[in-house]
Structure formats: C-alpha cells, structure tokens
Amino acid sequence: MGLHRVDLRPFPVSRSPFMAQPSTTYKFELNLTDLDRGVYETVKQTIARHPSETEERMTVRLLAYAFWYNEQLSFGRGLSDVDEPALWEKSLDDRVLHWIEVGQPDADRLTWCSRRTERTSLLAYGSLRVWEGKVIPAIKNLKNVNVAAVPQEVLDVLAKDMPRVIKWDVMISEGTIFVTDDRGQHEVQLQWLTGERG
C-alpha cells in the first residue's frame, strides 16, 4: 500500500472574534458488542458539548464513537476548533489515521480532511437530499472518504431529552447499530452514500 500524502495546512476559515462560551459536560458509559469486528468493550468518557452544538449532533458523535471504536479513538474539539474533527484516531507518533466528521460539511471541507489523514469517514444527518446531490458527486474520486447517512427518525428519538449521564448498550451486527438505553432498543440502519465502513 502506498504512502498517503498528508496536508497539514489549517482549514481556511475566518475566526470568530468573540470569547468562547463554556461547554456542557456529559458522562458517557458505553457497553459495546461489535460482532462484525469482534470488539467487546466497556468504556467511560466525559463529553464536552459546545454551546452551539445540538443534541442531534452530539448523539451522532456518540454513534460514530461506538461504530468505529478502538482504544486510540478520541473526541476532537470539533465546533470549537475547525482544524479538528468530531473524532479522530491517532498513532503513537501523532499521525492522524482516521478523521471522522458529522453533519453536512461541504466538498471543500471533506477534500481538506481527506488530505490530513489515511481515512476519512462522515456520518451525515438531517435533510440530506440537496446536500447529497451537491456534495457526493464532488467527492466520488476521493478514495479515502466514506460517507453514511443516519436515519432521522431514530436520531430524533435517541437525541430527545439527552440526560447528563448517558448509558448505552450497543450491539453492531452486519453494519446495523442497535442502541439500548433507558427507553428501550433503537435500530440504526446506516445508508452508505459512498464508500464503506472500513
């Protein structure tokens, strides 16, 4: 496999002159059974939610964490720092192995992300028809970018009234995510728009 050339230039965006507001912290307890990858872990994390971050976005970050979990995967600063992703996996020598975005970034953002890492993944959510028609054709040639859509109906249920201590039992089988919380079990069937889980 050839070396992937990494571009370390910052993302070209204007910086806000306003002082950052404090984030809200959440406790996340994950009991993970990933039958597809043979991963069985119980993990506890403290999650910072940016003041402008919706419950839906934070929920998708948690889904991404469970779906691509490994010991090196961690949450980035995301909304508070455009030069970091929602999540990333780094090597011991600080190379970015896997860059994970959530939401509806434009093609320029995904292209920029793909140049900083060996692999880029996106969990998209929300009203995707216009975004998909514009962005997916523009990134089809990016071989290290994989994009999946989270179904909005189940996301609405998972994200509603998110408690400060979040406890999920997650089973992943044949690419489907089954999340059990204090309200029952929820099936998250991702729709792959380009690429695959990897």
Residue ranges and their predicted role:
Residues 107-110, 193-198:
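Short, surface-exposed linear segments at secondary-structure transitions and domain or protein termini
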Residues 74-92:
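Long amphipathic N-terminal alpha/beta scaffold segment
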Residues 21-48, 119-123, 127-196:
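Helix-rich interaction surfaces within compact, conserved domain-sized segments
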Residues 1-18:
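N-terminal amphipathic/basic-hydrophobic helices that include classical n-h-c signal peptides
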Residues 34-79:
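Acidic-basic catalytic patches of nuclease active cores, encompassing PD-(D/E)XK
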Residues 110-114, 127:
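Short Lys/Arg-rich amphipathic alpha-helical segments
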Residues 87-89, 94-109:
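Conserved catalytic cores of phosphodiester-cleaving nucleases, focusing on short active-site segments
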Residues 70, 117-118:
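Short, well-ordered alpha-helix to beta-strand connector turns
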